[in-house]
Amino acid sequence: MEKSTMSAILLVLHLFVLLLQYSEVHSLATTSNHDFSYLRFAYDATDLELEGSYDYVIVGGGTSGCPLAATLSEKYKVLVLERGSLPTAYPNVLTADGFVYNLQQEDDGKTPVERFVSEDGIDNVRGRVLGGTSMINAGVYARANTSIYSASGVDWDMDLVNKTYEWVEDTIVFKPNYQPWQSVTGTAFLEAGVDPNHGFSLDHEAGTRITGSTFDNKGTRHAADELLNKGNSNNLRVGVHASVEKIIFSNAPGLTATGVIYRDSNGTPHRAFVRSKGEVIVSAGTIGTPQLLLLSGVGPESYLSSLNIPVVLSHPYVGQFLHDNPRNFINILPPNPIEPTIVTVLGISNDFYQCSFSSLPFTTPPFSFFPSTSYPLPNSTFAHFASKVAGPLSYGSLTLKSSSNVRVSPNVKFNYYSNPTDLSHCVSGMKKIGELLSTDALKPYKVEDLPGIEGFNILGIPLPKDQTDDAAFETFCRESVASYWHYHGGCLVGKVLDGDFRVTGIDALRVVDGSTFPYTPASHPQGFYLMLGRYVGIKILQERSASDLKILDSLKSAASLVL
């Protein structure tokens, strides 16, 4: 039997198995328009009071901040302060087609994608819109690797974790449509030995699977902002274009966060205070959270003093242990056009995570997509095969570029591949990409009928031809590295935070976002951070309820003594 015929049969069989396994996941969201019901309690910061008080002030309306706010609003007054715009101002964030466009759009200081370049010289981006990076990413959704929970320093309630994932998934996670290129990718992964075949699954497991997406079957994005709709609208207020400059502290009776100072788009300062038993919760992300703590005087004492920032509390690890997962890749230009697709099929191993997507050609390079602006641009549809190093172990730090202006992005350095284990994992991952390119499934996408990885029209840096030449692969990894946009760390549990995400040494101050752990939790982290916001919100509600019961019991006991 011809190899091409056998490949076609295998493709059909794999698709059949994947479709059969769709039913194993609980009921997910259904296709709909993006739900902006929360607009009735969202305001431009210019319309907010100059001074107000709330039970909880959440800095950052992003991937964790939105579900956290919705949860706390069930019982308490909550203010969310987001530096960016409402997504309605930038409709391209609401579609799958807009993913590349948003990276192409020039950064004017207001656009949803804020550009920055690390001190490693690698282009990168961060979200600047309500919904955070969940509003600008590629939409991949997965639950966290189960092994991370035991190593996290947090005493997780796993039943609650699972219920919390479902709370998110019921609203903004979808089973992806059949996409021809993704099916080809899945078949190639399986031919290359990325086993077993898990079909459709949200769980992070070694093997090949179709994963969830926050794009529905019409290509509409659903993101963290929609989780605000699950809150109590009478208790919830969202302010956009609100740049939080500093956390306010009190020393009586102990060091306590009592509120924040923020400015609106006109430069007018506002103050938001927290009531008794309330908290300031920083959810400004891996870049924004350590930056705000440093500007507020919480960080390494000698460093803050050198910048003439009054030291509120010496915390040596704020801004330290900053990690970013490197992305290395190969682009192929097929002889015939292929349909653009988002990522829905993943290949997972212990050391690396892989995916592919296809795209239309473009004349303006998407910022941070390729390692440099001099990278050649595709003149036809192309396929992008990416490998992400798990972990990683390499880390750097964040320092302030401005000691007084929160709008000036800080300096960040990730030190990609400074740890040799990460480099070894990249080599293994790119060799697996070589095996992928050698499969029968990808033969129709060659321009010449040549063996192995040869015969493709490669855009950019090609893979080393000798799959046994580790030194050549190491050079490839260093020269082709880009960001996977999954940076994390800077305010770690066990270093800056306790196991309840409280900043140690300060009352009424927590951090709930991607800065809290030293590793990426899954093939894509957004599922974990969406869960984290809801989870910590529930734990806070439980703490408050238990505290109120203790007070009530004490009052009853005192009353009985009087009687």
Curated annotation (Swiss-Prot):
<dbReference type="InterPro" id="IPR012132">
    <property type="entry name" value="GMC_OxRdtase"/>
</dbReference>
<feature type="binding site">
    <location>
        <begin position="525"/>
        <end position="526"/>
    </location>
    <ligand>
        <name>FAD</name>
    </ligand>
</feature>
<keyword id="KW-1015">Disulfide bond</keyword>
<comment type="function">
    <text>Involved in cyanogenesis, the release of HCN from injured tissues. Catalyzes the stereospecific addition of HCN to a variety of aldehydes in vitro. It is a major seed constituent, and could have the additional role of a storage form for reduced nitrogen.</text>
</comment>
<feature type="binding site">
    <location>
        <begin position="82"/>
        <end position="83"/>
    </location>
    <ligand>
        <name>FAD</name>
    </ligand>
</feature>
<feature type="binding site">
    <location>
        <position position="514"/>
    </location>
    <ligand>
        <name>FAD</name>
    </ligand>
</feature>
<dbReference type="GO" id="GO:0005773">
    <property type="term" value="C:vacuole"/>
</dbReference>
<dbReference type="Pfam" id="PF00732">
    <property type="entry name" value="GMC_oxred_N"/>
</dbReference>
<keyword id="KW-0285">Flavoprotein</keyword>
<feature type="glycosylation site" description="N-linked (GlcNAc...) asparagine">
    <location>
        <position position="145"/>
    </location>
</feature>
<dbReference type="InterPro" id="IPR000172">
    <property type="entry name" value="GMC_OxRdtase_N"/>
</dbReference>
<keyword id="KW-0456">Lyase</keyword>
<keyword id="KW-0274">FAD</keyword>
<keyword id="KW-0926">Vacuole</keyword>
<protein>
    <recommendedName>
        <fullName>(R)-mandelonitrile lyase 1</fullName>
        <ecNumber>4.1.2.10</ecNumber>
    </recommendedName>
</protein>
<comment type="subunit">
    <text>Monomer.</text>
</comment>
<comment type="similarity">
    <text>Belongs to the GMC oxidoreductase family.</text>
</comment>
<dbReference type="Pfam" id="PF05199">
    <property type="entry name" value="GMC_oxred_C"/>
</dbReference>
<feature type="binding site">
    <location>
        <position position="133"/>
    </location>
    <ligand>
        <name>FAD</name>
    </ligand>
</feature>
<feature type="binding site">
    <location>
        <position position="244"/>
    </location>
    <ligand>
        <name>FAD</name>
    </ligand>
</feature>
<dbReference type="InterPro" id="IPR051871">
    <property type="entry name" value="GMC_Oxidoreductase-Related"/>
</dbReference>
<keyword id="KW-0325">Glycoprotein</keyword>
<feature type="binding site">
    <location>
        <begin position="63"/>
        <end position="64"/>
    </location>
    <ligand>
        <name>FAD</name>
    </ligand>
</feature>
<feature type="active site" description="Proton acceptor">
    <location>
        <position position="524"/>
    </location>
</feature>
<feature type="glycosylation site" description="N-linked (GlcNAc...) asparagine">
    <location>
        <position position="162"/>
    </location>
</feature>
<dbReference type="GO" id="GO:0050660">
    <property type="term" value="F:flavin adenine dinucleotide binding"/>
</dbReference>
<feature type="binding site">
    <location>
        <position position="355"/>
    </location>
    <ligand>
        <name>substrate</name>
    </ligand>
</feature>
<feature type="signal peptide">
    <location>
        <begin position="1"/>
        <end position="27"/>
    </location>
</feature>
<feature type="binding site">
    <location>
        <begin position="485"/>
        <end position="486"/>
    </location>
    <ligand>
        <name>FAD</name>
    </ligand>
</feature>
<dbReference type="GO" id="GO:0016614">
    <property type="term" value="F:oxidoreductase activity, acting on CH-OH group of donors"/>
</dbReference>
<feature type="active site" description="Proton donor">
    <location>
        <position position="486"/>
    </location>
</feature>
<feature type="binding site">
    <location>
        <position position="129"/>
    </location>
    <ligand>
        <name>FAD</name>
    </ligand>
</feature>
<dbReference type="GO" id="GO:0033095">
    <property type="term" value="C:aleurone grain"/>
</dbReference>
<feature type="binding site">
    <location>
        <position position="484"/>
    </location>
    <ligand>
        <name>substrate</name>
    </ligand>
</feature>
<dbReference type="GO" id="GO:0046593">
    <property type="term" value="F:mandelonitrile lyase activity"/>
</dbReference>
<feature type="binding site">
    <location>
        <begin position="137"/>
        <end position="140"/>
    </location>
    <ligand>
        <name>FAD</name>
    </ligand>
</feature>
<feature type="disulfide bond">
    <location>
        <begin position="426"/>
        <end position="477"/>
    </location>
</feature>
<dbReference type="InterPro" id="IPR007867">
    <property type="entry name" value="GMC_OxRtase_C"/>
</dbReference>
<keyword id="KW-0732">Signal</keyword>
<dbReference type="InterPro" id="IPR036188">
    <property type="entry name" value="FAD/NAD-bd_sf"/>
</dbReference>
<feature type="glycosylation site" description="N-linked (GlcNAc...) asparagine">
    <location>
        <position position="379"/>
    </location>
</feature>
